[in-house]
């Protein structure tokens, strides 16, 4: 096979120039879509750059301009092409984008608000098919007729609300992995995490020609995790709404109060942004906008960076880091200007500011409500064994804003939600049960025990999984099951049969394992099409055809042959995919001959697997690796300043025999690299006692971060710098700081007089029957809302602790909060003493509100803990992650 270099051939250049002339001719047409001269000029410049960038796929992408397009269709396509990320240039073709454009312009022409939307708003927030890092699909083409019918006769405001109800019929909240499903895949599955719900809702709104954007707080300040929601542009103003969580009116949502405590809220604008909203980052093809002032009290913070001689440092990297999941997460990044200054508008809580340039670094904690500037001196000095304690305080919790709708309107909305739940539940009933799986397994001669979890996790994609298995030859059915077990749950939910078959049918061309142990290894690291967080696509047969016999023979004996080929043929561009952050497919990398580092690494693994060699991405280091028959070997495409293959060991020592800290909840470690520490990716929630006696890590400099989040959202944190020498063991004491302030009751209830109605029997239950001799945990829930689902997922993590405590636990429902789809069995693995009951007319909740002189309103879930005498010791309301940890702290005092 010819091993060409980075130079573009004369033939390719001529082809690109010809297509460029063809495309640019449209600028002289009578197009009315884009009239702003500055926008047109920038688009023309960017389009020429994109044509050269995408020259490897010029035919697939640009041949569409030879079609008989209308002037506006051409202009819309030109705008998309001018600013689209590498992932879209690599993995989609011109006809795909033409269909998107045609559907968008149809909506613009048919919807009554189409002519009311300003040009820039339309280009940034209606035309782009991509919302975030999802696999984009033909949702607009498929769903436009249904959505059009649904909103017929409505104004823009009411249409936006109605579309959110439509989305709720299709999808509800459930957590999942980091890969973002496409909108149609989420509908097929019937659920998605908040990032997927908001991607669906934004896409649905844009399908109707309504400007919409996905809005994120990258990390909360008062609790772990993040959240995404939607903003919709109505009659000249942006409003927010909860994706797939319809409220009676815009600017309502359970997240509205948490957002008032946020440190940053942001969104991305596609294209060259010249609007008036604050910009965090501006690139040629997108801008990241800072929306914090729309939600919370905020102010500018200025960071000055100096060197050891107190001279200003230009172009230093500045990260605004927030404690979350036991690490300091950069919610925003910037660079210093010629005056050594970087700034951001942020909420009024605490941040750790980290500045670095090359191997020089420094940091300081800042309390934004008390300070507006900080100077950080950077140096290359490292001091090990140093521990610093920091108290991180989030923005203060404020009195909830009053609800803007009447009780009657809220009640009617709740009835609609229950009806929509029923529609979705009816669809979910079409997913296959154990009886169907047993019959199918017998028909295929396979184990029902193995196939049951596969089909359960496939949800609405069960037909594709069944098609794949039934279409497999008898000799390969066992392999088909092994491969399905090796891919992710999300792959089972959205991968088509032909994609799975491409990997199975072409997996044995270069390798064929014998032993059962080898089979499992082979299925995971050779046969599987799942590598990292990319969309699984059919690249195996394609890649096998691209590399000739001579190359394959050389590759089998020398992995450097492939490394050299990639370095010579794949150009690295780490900026042109920033507004997508979706990895390019391996086939897309090969065709485009351009990739970011992550996609290049995935491509390396894909080629290895295609040619029968085990390979993976190491989840701890994110480096690509191949298996040499004995060990996993790193591949480093970038120059390194140290030997990354050298190892050392950490022995974690628990300083508290009564508490077993968990990774990414109570502590993390981060490894130093080029001026900054990045968290090592061990399993989330892994207990300290579960680590090996000596944990192998890359040798180098490290940072231990610990944290103890308090009930008010503040964190008692510490950082310890240490080093792991090559082949030596370093002992690290994991010390979780404690708050020894005694718990003071905030009120008292009468356990004998307080009664609930048992959900199952409808009989009255006195609270005194639940309290036993220890106390009771009371949790008021709204089962269909995301905050409650988080709490119900957190509590199983402390199940055994609550069971051993042996106090009472009751989950309390309000009659109007229970839909027909609710079942206690939907929440498995709760403590064995758990009961579900009704707090009639919210009597106890209202009494507790009176004791606290507050109104919890609809801010569910609400958690209250009493001792055996009815003294109320703990109270929490609203969205929080890790509530199980908070409960554990309180009941530990109730001996």
Regions found by a protein language model. Give the residues of each.
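Short, internal strand/loop/helix patches
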Residues: 824-860
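Hydrophobic/aromatic-rich core segments of domains that either
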Residues: 35, 149-150, 154, 159-165, ...
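Short Pro-Gly-centered beta-turn/loop motif in secreted/extracellular proteins
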Residues: 341-352, 357-359, 366-369, 686-712, ...
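Structured interaction patches on ligand/partner-binding surfaces of diverse proteins
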Residues: 359-381, 710-738
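Secondary-structure boundary elements
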Residues: 36-189, 225, 262, 411, ...
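Short, ordered, surface-exposed loop/turn motifs in non-cytosolic proteins
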Residues: 308-327, 348-350, 558, 657-681, ...
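Short, acidic Ser/Thr/Gly-rich low-complexity loop/linker segments typical of extracellular
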Residues: 324-346, 674-691
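Short active-site neighborhood of thiol/selenol oxidoreductases, capturing the structured segment around
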Residues: 767-791, 795, 810-812
